[in-house]
């Protein structure tokens, strides 16, 4: 009489995922402009949240610049804080 249950979950990593790369490094962009709203929208969810680095594939430097640019654009009312 053991209390162990049979595991029916699939393995978490069934296949190796594709290597993500920083779009800004590949295009050799040094400064992310907060006025370029179309580029910033690509790194936000439909609810207006910033997509994390592990999903977007950005390097640490550009992810910091990206979050600062999005926050500046929100403050200047170029991007919404929350989308309903």
Swiss-Prot record:
<dbReference type="GO" id="GO:0070181">
    <property type="term" value="F:small ribosomal subunit rRNA binding"/>
</dbReference>
<comment type="subunit">
    <text>Part of the 30S ribosomal subunit. Forms a tight heterodimer with protein bS6.</text>
</comment>
<keyword id="KW-0699">rRNA-binding</keyword>
<dbReference type="InterPro" id="IPR001648">
    <property type="entry name" value="Ribosomal_bS18"/>
</dbReference>
<dbReference type="GO" id="GO:0003735">
    <property type="term" value="F:structural constituent of ribosome"/>
</dbReference>
<keyword id="KW-0689">Ribosomal protein</keyword>
<comment type="function">
    <text>Binds as a heterodimer with protein bS6 to the central domain of the 16S rRNA, where it helps stabilize the platform of the 30S subunit.</text>
</comment>
<protein>
    <recommendedName>
        <fullName>Small ribosomal subunit protein bS18</fullName>
    </recommendedName>
</protein>
<dbReference type="InterPro" id="IPR018275">
    <property type="entry name" value="Ribosomal_bS18_CS"/>
</dbReference>
<keyword id="KW-0694">RNA-binding</keyword>
<dbReference type="GO" id="GO:0006412">
    <property type="term" value="P:translation"/>
</dbReference>
<dbReference type="Pfam" id="PF01084">
    <property type="entry name" value="Ribosomal_S18"/>
</dbReference>
<dbReference type="GO" id="GO:0022627">
    <property type="term" value="C:cytosolic small ribosomal subunit"/>
</dbReference>
<comment type="similarity">
    <text>Belongs to the bacterial ribosomal protein bS18 family.</text>
</comment>
<keyword id="KW-0687">Ribonucleoprotein</keyword>
<dbReference type="InterPro" id="IPR036870">
    <property type="entry name" value="Ribosomal_bS18_sf"/>
</dbReference>
